[in-house]
From Swiss-Prot:
Its main location: nucleus. The keyword Cell division applies. This is Protein asunder. It comes from Drosophila ananassae (Fruit fly). Residues 571-612 are annotated as: Disordered. Keywords: Cell cycle, Cell division, Coiled coil, Cytoplasm, Developmental protein, Differentiation, Meiosis, Mitosis, Nucleus, Phosphoprotein, Spermatogenesis. The gene is asun.
Amino acid sequence: MFEQNQKTIFVLDHTRYFSIASEDYISMDFLKGKPSVDTGTGAGVGGASGLGTQFSKSLWTCACESSIEYCRVVWDLFPGKKHVRFIVSDTAAHIVNTWSTSTQNMSHVMNAMVMVGVPSRSMPQSSDYSVIHGLRAAIEALAEPTDEQLATIASGEPVHIPNEGRVICITSARDNTSMKSLEDIFNTVLIQQNALAGPPAKKGLAIDHCHLVILNIVPLGVESLVTNRGLLNISPLLDVEIHTVSAPDISHKLTHLILDHYNLASTTVTNIPMKEEQNANSSANYDVEILHSRSAHSIACGPDFSLPTSIKPGATYETVTLKWCTPRGCGSADLQPCLGQFLVTPVDVTSRPSSCLINFLLNGRSVLLEMPRKAGSKATSHMLSARGGEIFIHSLCITRSCMDEAPAIGDGPGGRVTDYRTTELGQLMKMSRMVPLKAKDPTAPGLPRRMPRYFPLTNGSSILFHLQRHISWMPHFLHLLVKEDMDKQEEVRCQQHIHELYKSASRGDMLPFTHTNGARLKLSKAKDQYRLLYRELEQLIHLNATTVHHKNLLESLQSLRAAYGEAKSEPNSSLLRSYTESPHSPERLEPIPSGGSSGSNSNSLLKASKRRMSSCGQRSLLDIISSAERSQANKRLDFSGRLCTPLGQVAKLYPDFGNKEKDSLLAGTTAAPNVKEESIRS
């Protein structure tokens, strides 16, 4: 309830230095007619030159305007919820307003600032004029309870009332040493105030934490010796950040700070059609920047949308760019549920585009805003409308609504995947179900590691599981392969199915499948189809080879693969990877190159498979990676310098480089063939 932005206090330096000009000159062309004729004195009407009259705001005016604009945004977006106070400091601290609701308004603050006025240049240069008086008063103001805190105290609940706040000090310091002294004084006074808040004095509330923001203001074009510094924790009670900014840019800086202080976002409504003042028959497009809660964008954006952001000239913060949508008739298909509404306030409330947009909305009209999708199209994501004299931005639901029915898993996300193996996944979950046992089962740890190692999520990502839709005996055959307790009769039945596949391959029958993994395949040859099928079948049997019957099936399949010519090099290994591999695919079993007859190929395959089965449980991931690196290194010759140099010594790179005798010998050997060629030609 009581957050850090509940209390914000502006401390404005009212010393003599703030009476100087900001050096940002504004041209004032008050004559619409022709420029006055130069009489030779170099001045025209009113003492102005041909360029017109120019004036510059003082540092005090820049500080007052930007700070009042800060509190206007706060009071527009959080009416009656967030409090802002002003303290003017010169020889003493002058309180502009209090935490009372009657003084938390723009008219009271502006009237008080008019009474304070610009600092006089004839003000004496004395140490009595200091911003420290205002900082002391700001700490005392933080200890004063607001109306909400007083209501909590009056309720009689014995709870600790959080009391945090933020102090924004607009001053001008000479160097970093002066800034360090301000921090130390502020921290000391803060500790003293908390001591007074405790018993027996009990003067005000204890300050749990304070955020001090110091804005060091300098005229335009003047270099400052004070360096910028991000948020720094000075003590458990105090965080300090320092910003050095020129006077004309202080409004942009405070707008940037208010975004973080109150979790706001900036949105620029672009391409607003507006009639020109000079020519009512033509119109131009204008942009209006508005501020609102950051949640207006976060709750509306989904994964298919990206916020278009940009940085305005002179600003340091990003603004979201939304395009004005031309009003059109909305049918039932265009109606969208609203996810939330948030108050809106313009950044430049006095500009003509802002006033036109505000009047347009206050007259009962609504504005739809568009944002782009990642695919390139656009969607209506927000709407501006007014109710009760206040303007709101509505976040529209541009993704799947919570009121829509959830899609079935068979439809897939967005209807892109439709062949999920939901039934098989349910069976796998039932088979992998674990229950607590009183005694340890030695076979229990191996079961969850073995079963989910290869499970294609869709039928289209596997040839083997894709065929069970078209071959009647294939589902029962796959069920027998993954059984943990296969008997001899089931082994014979599986052997028959494997031989049946071999007979079909010998006849050249095409397998009854069309496509896999959503791609159009070019497997016109039956040999390519059966090669991929055999390799995936071997992987599945190898993963479930826990009994003697499984191992017999594996040996039989490998013998058939060798007889069918699978022991040769595989040109379509990339096809196999695209078909059979999934995130849970096992390591591929590469065949051994053949060097003789089919019988020797079968024996070598059987020996290799037995060697793999005996060592698969003992090899670690490091062993697998090391063996792969060694096999890759053995394919190419090592560096000759490493081979010829004894161990422990450094090989010399290009040892014959620069050896003149060696070069002369090489030149002689190259010249001899040339002489011989000339003698032959002659």
